[in-house]
């Protein structure tokens, strides 16, 4: 097979694929703003679909008072962003995932939960969290994934008081 490449000037426009990281954050920002806005050019990855499903699960009414069931697929971003958001809007959640997602470390959140008296249990591939985000200081090590910081920064303004995140 012969291929000939001829240099020439190109015209047109290219729309690069959206950043998955930014797409997660945009979906959550819109959901927390009561859906007042429009998103376009979002990544349609399985991770973004998982975030959208979890947002819908958080919005669903549960007359029995049960915690929402949040299937995060294989998305670490979805899981780490939504753990504190679920505490802020629903008093907690029951999280599950696929692949090795539920084996990923959540230690920075667990340390906060111990300090704040928030219940958590990780067993058989399911993470249950239940409690209330209260005013005060939320400390995270400076070397943790930005996913932990983002989750807290999205969740804490939804609660009364004047919380602080320290790195």
Language model features with spans:
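Structural preference for solvent-exposed beta-strand-turn elements
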Residues: 1-167
């Amino acid at each position: 097979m012969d291929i000939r490449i001829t240099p020439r000037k190109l015209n047109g426009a290219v729309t690069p694929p959206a950043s998955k990281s930014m797409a997660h954050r945009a979906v959550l920002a819109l959901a927390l703003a009561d859906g007042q806005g429009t998103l376009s050019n979002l990544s349609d990855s399985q991770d973004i679909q998982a975030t959208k499903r979890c947002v819908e699960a958080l919005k669903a009414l549960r007359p029995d008072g049960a915690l929402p069931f949040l299937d995060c697929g294989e998305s670490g971003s979805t899981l780490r962003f939504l753990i504190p958001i679920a505490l802020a809007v629903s008093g907690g959640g029951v999280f599950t995932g696929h692949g090795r997602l539920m084996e990923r470390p959540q230690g920075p959140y667990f340390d906060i939960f111990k300090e704040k008296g928030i219940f958590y249990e990780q067993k058989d591939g399911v993470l249950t969290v239940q409690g209330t985000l209260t005013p005060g200081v939320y400390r995270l090590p400076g070397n943790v994934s930005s996913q932990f910081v983002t989750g807290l920064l999205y969740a804490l303004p939804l609660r009364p008081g004047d919380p602080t995140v320290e790195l």
